[in-house]
Amino acid sequence: MNFLDESFWLAVSFVIFLYLVYRPAKKAILNSLDAKILEVQEKVLQAEKLKEDAALLFKHTNAQIKKLETLRSQMIEDSNEVTKKIIQEKTKEIEEFLEHKKSDAIQLMQNQKSTASKELQDEFCDEVIKLVSEYFQSVKLSESNIAKNLMDKSDFPQDEGKAT
């Protein structure tokens, strides 16, 4: 190995050159790498924070869904109860209405029956009076004879009771 050989000095020069170039570039490269590392760490932290936020949001959303499902089922139950109450009330009202109409119809029929019976009695009495009056006129009895005959007839059933 000869120290005066140009390849040797070329190699030494190249090593010195590399050292001189690497020395200032080392800081720039390290700073750049540190910046990239910090950037990656920051992104990882952001991703972890987003993951935690998403998990929290998922929990919160599930809790809200459960609350809403509970509320929905409660509302359905309440509406079913209200519907049943309304149906019972309306059924009761209809039954009362029908019972009232039935009693009104019965009362109307009884009134009509009473009226018809009264009319028939009145017609019958009028007809009997008319027939009796015609009979007495045909027999040509006087009022005193009518009274006398009526008195005699009223005594007759009593005598009949004594005879037996």
Curated annotation (Swiss-Prot):
Keywords, sorted A to Z: ATP synthesis, Cell inner membrane, Cell membrane, CF(0), Hydrogen ion transport, Ion transport, Membrane, Transmembrane, Transmembrane helix, Transport
Source organism, top-level taxon: Bacteria
Protein's UniProt keywords contain Cell membrane: yes
Membrane-spanning intervals of the chain: 7-25
Membrane topology of this protein: Single-pass membrane protein
Function text: F(1)F(0) ATP synthase produces ATP from ADP in the presence of a proton or sodium gradient. F-type ATPases consist of two structural domains, F(1) containing the extramembraneous catalytic core and F(0) containing the membrane proton channel, linked together by a central stalk and a peripheral stalk. During catalysis, ATP synthesis in the catalytic domain of F(1) is coupled via a rotary mechanism of the central stalk subunits to proton translocation. Component of the F(0) channel, it forms part of the peripheral stalk, linking F(1) to F(0).
Protein name as catalogued: ATP synthase subunit b
